[in-house]
Amino acid sequence: MRCLKSLLAFFTAFPIGGAELSFKCVWALPYVAAPIIAAIPTTLLYLGASPAIAYIALLAATGLHHLDGLADVGDALLVRDREAARRVLEDPRRGTGGIFAVTAVVVTTAAHLHSPLQLLLGEVFSKSTALLFAGFSKSFKPGLGEAFTEAAKRQWPAALPALAVLAYLAPVTTAVSLATSALLYQLAYRHLGGANGDVYGYLLEVSRSAFVIWSAYVPVPTAF
């Protein structure tokens, strides 16, 4: 229970006290963290709130931590030199690349969002993908990203049942979303020479968006 509290304290904005930072339960990301994060946003969407409001609520539930990673990586991708790009990740100032990345992801995702199930499955996909990809990654610096990577190397198989369920419910959407997420992740991973917390935040955001966007175009169950 303590490690689950730690996981939720790190990946959500909910006030969970007395939790020491630990990734021992990182396997629970798709099964515990994702449904909890999506609970309020999906309820809002079900009750008639606009997709934009529901998506903003979901981002708020994550504490905007992953969105910050998206912005940092967006800035870093505009810098050609690897070492300079890594330094950009530490710069608190926001550049054109970061502003564009955040705006593009949020606006396009909200524009393609139209059902609570779509949002819930998108969040499960995001957490599953991050766990899976991190299991085969390396960190380029010490820190939380390194700790997440090391934990994922041991626990990445836990992502497979969640992805299998998604593939059963929406096979084409899941497949093309995995391919899209892999391409976008490799873009940042190769540019920076590895992963860190910002790169994983970027991955969490773009993978969720990929699933939501593709599910609006690819034939999926009528529940969508």
Curated annotation (Swiss-Prot):
Cofactors that this protein relies on: Mg(2+)
Catalytic activity: alpha-ribazole + adenosylcob(III)inamide-GDP = adenosylcob(III)alamin + GMP + H(+); alpha-ribazole 5'-phosphate + adenosylcob(III)inamide-GDP = adenosylcob(III)alamin 5'-phosphate + GMP + H(+)
Compartment(s) of residence: Cell membrane
Listed EC numbers: 2.7.8.26
Function: Joins adenosylcobinamide-GDP and alpha-ribazole to generate adenosylcobalamin (Ado-cobalamin). Also synthesizes adenosylcobalamin 5'-phosphate from adenosylcobinamide-GDP and alpha-ribazole 5'-phosphate.
The keyword Membrane is assigned to this record: yes
PANTHER family, per the entry: ADENOSYLCOBINAMIDE-GDP RIBAZOLETRANSFERASE
Membrane topology annotation: Multi-pass membrane protein
InterPro entries the UniProt entry points to: CobS (IPR003805)
Enzyme class: transferase
Gene Ontology MF term list: adenosylcobinamide-GDP ribazoletransferase activity; cobalamin 5'-phosphate synthase activity
Biological processes annotated in GO: cobalamin biosynthetic process
Gene that specifies this protein: cobS
Chief localisation class: membrane
Pfam families linked to this entry: CobS
Similarity comment: family membership: Belongs to the CobS family.
Residues of the signal peptide: none
Full protein name: Adenosylcobinamide-GDP ribazoletransferase
Pathway(s) served: Cofactor biosynthesis; adenosylcobalamin biosynthesis; adenosylcobalamin from cob(II)yrinate a,c-diamide: step 7/7
Transmembrane segments: 21-41, 44-64, 97-117, 156-176
Keywords: Cell membrane, Cobalamin biosynthesis, Magnesium, Membrane, Transferase, Transmembrane, Transmembrane helix
Keyword tRNA-binding assigned: no
Recorded GO CC terms: plasma membrane
